[in-house]
Amino acid sequence: METLQRTANRGSISTDTSFQVDNSLKTDEHAGEYFYRNSPTAGNKRTFTFSFRIKRTQLTGYVADPYLMSQGSNQRFHFAGDSLRFMFDGNSTELEASGRLRDTSAWYHVVLAVDTTQSTAANRVKAYLNGQDYPWNNTKYPSQNSESGWMSGSSMYFNTRDGDGAYHNSAYWAEVVVIDGQQLSATDFGEFDSDTGIWKPKNVSGLNFGNEGFYLNFQDSSDLGADVSGNNNDCTLNNIAAADQSTDTCTNNFCTINVINLSTQTLTEGATKIVSTDNTSRTSFGTMAVSKGKWWWEGKIQVYESADSYPCIGVTGDLDNPPATSAQLWKGNHVVVLAKAQKWVTNDTGYSYGTAYADNDIINIALDMDNHIMYTYKNGTIDDASGINFSSQSAATADDFYIPINLVYVTGGGSSWEMNFGGFANYTISSGATDDNGYGTFEYAPPSGYYALCTKNLEEYG
């Protein structure tokens, strides 16, 4: 299970005080969300650069070859088996890279730089991933001085195939840049941190974008397609609204639900909404694990589809052998609350709490890993001030990592959770509460000393 722990280096999770990216754009394949530059004037069709940062929330296999960019029927930049594939002008100039982008807990920085005037074929199309050369598997380079449909007068699409309403990505996007007339390198957009070695973004506002270039930073929720390069080459949004703005970014990466471990559940809304509809117990996990510190997140019960549906929320310390059935919840290193049964479950014991949860209730988790106690709240009100102590669990005594967990225990029907770890929530938040560091956006404020599960806080407290 791919999980971000405090010791991991996942590209562009900078915690320093240099250039910070405040916002990203959430796109969802199931909602047909994409954006595009509508009918631009033709730019330089031989020399150009694309740069963007992306955090995937769905992998190839769920959607066949999801598209990153397209412009016309023969110009495509998309995933193929979770590797990058670029089509300069038809199949005769199609290049595919070797490495796979399968870590859904990570932000990736992708740069594609083209200059067909180069005499050396390998220099005509260059790709970079997190600041390093990203080699191509084949050598179908364009001929010298050839022109393509890229940077032409046709519309340039992001997150779909040429606007045909298909092959969308589910992902977070940040720092989308198009450069007209220059072949730039990765170091024009980012740099390696001198202390940590992490690839981090630079402020790109001073770049020469060229006449048809643009820069999307997604900071204005009322105009998410706004070009802030100075060119006013704004993009048009399709099925994207202000609510799709996120604070999960390449400089502060938030926990989400891990797509890697799903079976039949449906994961949408930036990997925050999980739906289980079959007659089987299903488990899902977060992308970040902790062994110390105090942490806060929320989960909204969206629907009970059956009288025998029991949504559960909590943590597990069995990262390699998590519970897959309701019976397994009572064994091992798990601490969960059964939303409908009014039970905390740990160490083969059930403990009663206040009133049962109902549809649309928000359950808050306050996880104290320093003392190994989990507290639960119903719509901001604590269930039991004593919490549930799990310090005797073998994972706790070994100071092992615990990870957020959701389980839908059903004997008929199903249910769903809308999770909010602070970076994005599918439900409307009226209060906009943050932790003491100003991170996260929650319906209910974290208690003092409890923090959102994000890389800024993990670096300091995790």
Regions found by a protein language model. Give the residues of each.
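Extended recognition patches within non-cytosolic domains
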Residues: M1-N23, H30-A31, S119-A121, P135-Y141, ...
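Glycine-aromatic-enriched beta-strand/loop faces of beta-sandwich-type recognition domains
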Residues: D89, C312-I362
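Low-complexity, glycine/proline/serine-rich flexible segments
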Residues: M1-R46, S83-R85, G90-S92, S152-S154, ...
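Extracellular glycan-interaction patches encoded by glycine-rich segments
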Residues: T93, S148-W173, V408-T411
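Short surface loop/edge beta-strand patches of beta-sandwich-type extracellular domains
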Residues: E29-F48, E94-R102, D162-G165, K200-G206, ...
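Extracellular glycan-recognition modules
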Residues: A31-R85, Q118-A121, Q182-T187, V290-K292, ...
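Short hydrophobic/aromatic patches on beta-strands that form ligand-binding or substrate-lining surfaces
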Residues: F50-Q58, V110-L112, F158, S170-V178, ...
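Extracellular glycan-interaction surfaces
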Residues: T3-E29, S51-T60, Q75-S146, V345-Y353, ...
